[in-house]
């Protein structure tokens, strides 16, 4: 079969300014997958930065062996779909990523997939309807409430109505604005003010009083619709749901144990500053309850593929913060739970053989990967483990067997030599560095995230963290190191 994996980008992107480097590279990972499924043709069709699919150096795409690489150039979904159709695909898999300021690439990829399906191509992609619900945070809030999922109480503020008198001179009294402030006064403070269409926590503000909310809504910061939510205190987490659509039209979701996220000084998880630890399958967090609820969520929204969920454990109950039907910054860590690489999981989705609970086929594939690549990164990312141990991990929902722990921590910019030196450590699984030459603020310049672990106790994970600090004292950032130590200590 001819398999096409695609993603798009609606933003201007200059590869001479923004540099992304991963170890192992996507070129290596996709070459390995294509080699192990050599009876199929692989096409990677993307727009830069082509996250999860392609590597690039300045403007040149680094092509993978045994893989056809195509740079998409269309603007509309119709144009992009035509480019993909020209590749004559049997299957097309969306590998959507995220951008700022609008988290709508999943929606664009869904429209492309819808056109492909209409033209007879089998796709693995979330529907346009699902993406539309999750793109707009107010629509998400309504969906969660209507379907009895726990989430924060919230008030939606329509920008045009809030300032209705500016465009309608006959308006003497803005009734809508009075209504909005009355509704906000009923919320428990503090509250979070967020854009209804922004990505993750970008632009969010924690506000502690009603006068402060008034000041915000009367400021230039308020320039589009906002969602004002109660701030739910508690530990923040994230996880992924991998969902297969069956031949009978039913859906089989697999919810992975959650990763714990650190928060910034405002109590918000920041993508550029967070430390992630997990997966955590602990009784005290009622992960069985979480799994059941998220399986229900996946079936109602009819997920197909990978979706990421942000959560908070508030007053001994799970609450949903955000739903992202796309790949995420946690996708590499989640793949490791399956002892796979992300490209391998996407390939199995394309071939219709992906089963998050399977053991026999997965073990066979993993062993082939490691046997044929014993001197490269596969030794780390696809560790060969006994069938009994693998089965115990996959069936942990019943046996409560502990999953191997991983930590995702961020470093300042590293040289390529430093990145490769870190990767020589046997427990370091993955590095990804983003560097923006045009940025002026420190946090905007980018960072290098390191994923390490694969051990079954927090003590062992802490020892790995200490080894990194000892061997690379010049690059580790103390604030992230201390946060990671505290998070690991919370499990001891």
Regions found by a protein language model. Give the residues of each.
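A conserved helix-loop-beta module that forms one wall/lid of the active-site cleft
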Residues: 113, 117-203
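Glycine-rich phosphate-binding loop of ATP-grasp-fold ATP-dependent ligases
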Residues: 153-165, 190-216, 236-238, 263-282, ...
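Conserved ATP-binding module of the ATP-grasp superfamily
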Residues: 151, 173-175, 186, 190-193, ...
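Peripheral (often C-terminal) accessory segments that flank ATP-dependent C-N-forming ligase machineries
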Residues: 347-371, 378-379, 383-492
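Conserved metal-phosphate-binding beta-hairpin within the catalytic cores
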Residues: 298-332, 387, 392-400, 410-412
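ATP-binding N-terminal substructure of ATP-dependent carboxylate-amine bond-forming enzymes
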Residues: 1-123, 163-166, 368, 372, ...
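Short acidic-hydrophobic, aromatic-tinged amphipathic segments that line or gate anion-handling sites
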Residues: 67-76, 155-156, 172-175, 205-208
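ATP-dependent carboxylate/phosphate-activation module, predominantly the ATP-grasp catalytic core
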Residues: 229-301, 324-350
